[in-house]
Amino acid sequence: MPILKKCIAFLLLITTLQQVAFSQSHLVSLREIINEAGIPAISLAYIKDGKLQEQYNTGIKSAESKEPVNDSTVFSACSLSKSVFSYAVYKLVKSKKLDLDRPLYLYYAYKDVEEDERYKQVTARMILTHSSGLPNWRNGKLKFKYDPGKQFSYSGEGFVWLSKVIEKITGEPVEAYMQETVFRPLAMHHSSYIWQKNFDSNYAYPHTDNERSTQKDFPSTANVAASLQTNSTDCAKFMVAVLNDKDFLSTFKTDTGIFVDKNIRWNMGFGVEQTSYGKTNFQWGDNGTFKTFLITYPDKKEGLVYFTNSENGLDIARDVLKLFFNSDQPALDWLKLDSAKAPRLQVYLQGLKMPVADAIAPYLLPGKKTVDTILLSQSSIVDIANRYEELGYYDKAITLLELNLVNYPSSASTYRSLGETYMRMGDVNKSAETWKKAYALDKQYDYPQTLANHLLNIPDAIDTSKKKITLQLPDYINAHFVTVAGSFNNWNNAIQPMHWINGAWETTIQLTPGTYRYKFVVDGVWITDPKNPNFNKDSFDSILEVN
C-alpha cells in the first residue's frame, strides 16, 4: 500500500511538472507572438475538461507607462459582448419569459424601425443568428438591408433592439439584468457594460497598429453589442458556465443556425465551424484598437479566450490557437486572418522602423525589383500602403504603390490608392491625373472620374431638381486636404474635396430638399462647421436644411 501511494504521488508530481513546463512554454511563446506583432499586452485563459487550466497576463497596459497587466486588468470585450449577452437571453428563454420565435414587436414596439412592416417579422432567434436583415450600425435612420430571416448579415443594431426587449420584459435596465443574471452569480467582479469606478485603477489603454496609445472609451450607457468591459479571468468563468450548462448547449445547439458559407453557420450568439478537432463555437471582437477572440469545443468542454489592447490583436489569432489546438480553423480563413509572421504584417511593422524599401526587400524576386507575388499579393501591398497613408506616411505608401505598378501596371485599385495618397498630400494635379487612370482601367466605378473633376474644380452637370449649396470653412490656411462628408455622400471623407478660394475652403454641391448632417474633414480631423449654429448635441454633426 505505501508503494502504491508513492507511485500515485510520483505520477501526480510528473503530471504537475509537465503542466508547469507547458505553461512556461506557452508563456514564452505568447510573449514572442505579441512582440512580433507589435501588441503591448495579452490576457488569455484556456479551459480544459470544463475548468480553467491555464491563464496568462503578459505585457503592458500602456506604451507610455510601461505598467504591466495582471489578472484584474480590464480590457474592452468588443463583440464578445454579444456572446455574454446571449447567455442572459437564454436565461429568459429557460424561464419561459421569452420565446425565441415570437415576433419581438409583440413584446416591445421599437420605434426606430416600426415604419417598415418587415419589423413585425423579426424574432430573437433572427437577431441572435444575425439574420434580422438590419445593418451592423445605422448611418442616419435605421433601415433594413435585407428581408428578415433570409440571410446572414452581421448586426450590432439587432442586439441593441433585443436589449430593449429584455428591458421591457424584466422591467429593469439591461446592465442591472446582466449583473443579476450573469456577472454576480458567476463572480465576474471585473465585468460591466458600463464603466465602473473600481476599473479606474487597473485598465488597459488601446493602441494603434504602430504601438501608439490612444484615447480610451469609458461607456456611460450599456451597449450589449460592444461595450462590455472585462478580462480573461472573468470571461473564463463565463466559458466554464456555458460549457457545463447542458440546457444551454441543447437550447443553443451547434447544428442549427443560419449558414454563412459552406463551413460556417451562425448559431444563437456564436459562430459555428466544423474543424478536424470537432465542432466549435467562436466569436471575434474588433473595436478598432482592442481586439479579442473566443473559441470553445462544447463536446470536449475545452476552449480559449484572449484579449489584446492593440489594433493588431486579431493578426495573432492563428498563432495563438496553434499553441493550444492541433486543428484547422475555417473561421480564421473566413475572417481572412493571417499569422503574425505573415509577410503582409511584417512588411508593415518593419516599415515603421526603417525605410519601407528595406522592409520589403526580402520579398522581392532575386536580382529583380518585382515582388514575389506568392508571398505578397497585389491586394496585400495596397492594404499596407493604405495603412501608411492613414498614418500620414505618404512617402512610404507611394513607394509601395509604385512598386505594385511594376508588377501590375493595369491595377485600377493601385491607382485608386495612389490617387488618394496624392490627394491627402495636397497634390491636386497628380491626384486628378491618377484618378483618371484608375477610371480608364476600370469603369465599373465612376467615382474616380467624379473625384478627378472635383479636384480640378470642374462642376457636376446641372440637375434642375436639386439646389446648389455652397459650403465654406474659413482659416486652416496650412491644411493640405479638406473635404466635406455627410449624409448626402454616405459620410465619404474623400469624394467632396474643398478648394482654397478667397481666404476660405469652399465647395459647391447639389442637393434635393431635405435635412442633412455633415462635418468638415481637415487633414483627417473631423470638425463641426464653425459658421453653422445648428448642430446635433450628441454627435456634433452640423445640420443643413435645404428648402
For the regions a protein language model found, what residue spans apply to each?
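Active-site helix/loop module of the DD-peptidase/beta-lactamase fold
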Residues: 23, 76-80, 92-135, 169-211
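Catalytic loop of the DD-peptidase/beta-lactamase superfamily, centered on the K-T-G motif
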Residues: 24-57, 167-172, 176-180, 184, ...
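Aromatic-rich carbohydrate-binding modules that target alpha-glucans
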Residues: 460-515, 521-547
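Short active-site loop at a secondary-structure junction
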Residues: 33-43, 64-126, 144-157, 223-226, ...
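Catalytic-site signature segments of enzymes, centered on catalytic residues
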Residues: 74, 129-202, 216, 221-236
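Alpha-helical scaffold elements that line and support the substrate/ligand-binding pocket
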Residues: 44-46, 50-51, 76-99, 103, ...
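N-terminal leader/targeting segments and the immediately adjacent pre-domain N-terminus
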Residues: 3-12, 18-75, 91-99, 129, ...
